[in-house]
């Protein structure tokens, strides 16, 4: 698999950051004092290799997530920058942690001593960028209608990105060239739900029929279906998400370095999910979670 080098990762951040984001980074870190913000933003956009280091700066975290006047800059920050800062903050916090709480119910937490594995996951700049992009993509989760041919006649069907069964149903009707993208997004949804809304994933566990349909969509051999449909909800979502990412990678017509990160996360899906649990608990929900509406029951 190809790997993303520092320049490619930096460019990935630059693709998402607004000029206001870049001005915020320059202002808070004082990396670029002169000339004024527009020129500072242009300089950073032309030197994106500096962006990950600036996003990880503790002063930027305080400017975005700090209390009161410290967070005055937060109104300038895009959702992508906010999530990127949260991901880098998690990497910093995990450096001094030996255990990370795992949710055992709406209010319950049990300590799991897997912090070294989570540190290793966030040790990759490409995986940090992946998580920031994933979170930002769900601030505008898609929904609407798509066209399907039913009994030889075109029909309009409604869909929501968070409805895994309906999204998987599109695999039967879309052109073959579109299927890798749907598999990728199915994996994204499984990771997002178990990472940010694990209580919802447990409370709305898949029934045997839906689980079997999704296992079939994930190209899981039928002999494994019975065992997997009775697995705990989070375990099943983890299995499906990793499987969908692998199928997306295997079907991709061009295997780029950016897509290779998807295959990499497939092998570390549980660590990715646990990192998102930590980010949600420490950064997103304590601030009131203005970014994500809870999934509909």
Stretches found by the model and what they are:
Residues 1-266:
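Long, non-catalytic protein-protein interaction scaffolds
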Residues 287, 293-297:
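Helix-rich, well-folded core regions that mediate interactions or catalysis
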């Amino acid at each position: 698999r190809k790997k993303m080098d520092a320049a490619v990762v930096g460019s990935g951040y630059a693709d998402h950051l607004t000029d206001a984001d870049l001005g915020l980074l320059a202002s808070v870190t004082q990396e670029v004092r002169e000339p004024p913000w527009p020129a500072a933003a242009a300089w950073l956009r032309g030197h994106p290799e500096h962006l990950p280091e600036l996003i990880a700066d503790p002063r930027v975290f305080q400017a975005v997530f700090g209390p009161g006047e410290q967070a005055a800059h937060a109104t300038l920050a895009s959702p992508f920058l906010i999530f990127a800062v949260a991901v880098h903050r998690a990497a910093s916090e995990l450096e001094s942690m030996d255990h990370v709480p795992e949710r055992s119910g709406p209010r319950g937490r049990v300590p799991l001593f897997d912090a070294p594995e989570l540190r290793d996951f966030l040790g990759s700049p490409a995986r940090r960028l992946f998580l920031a992009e994933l979170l930002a993509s769900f601030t505008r989760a898609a929904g609407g209608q798509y066209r399907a041919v039913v009994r030889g006649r075109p029909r309009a069907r409604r869909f929501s990105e968070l409805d895994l069964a309906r999204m998987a149903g599109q695999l039967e009707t879309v052109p073959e060239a579109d299927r890798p993208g749907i598999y990728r997004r199915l994996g994204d949804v499984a990771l997002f739900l178990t990472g940010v809304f694990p209580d919802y994933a447990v409370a709305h566990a898949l029934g045997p029929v839906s689980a079997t349909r999704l296992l079939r969509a994930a190209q899981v051999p039928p002999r494994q279906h019975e065992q997997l449909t009775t697995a705990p909800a989070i375990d099943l979502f983890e299995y499906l998400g990793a499987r969908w990412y692998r199928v997306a990678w295997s079907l991709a017509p061009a295997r780029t370095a950016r897509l290779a990160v998807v295959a990499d996360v497939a092998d570390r899906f549980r660590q990715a999910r646990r990192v998102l649990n930590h980010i949600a608990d420490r950064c997103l929900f304590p601030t009131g979670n203005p970014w994500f509406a809870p999934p509909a029951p």
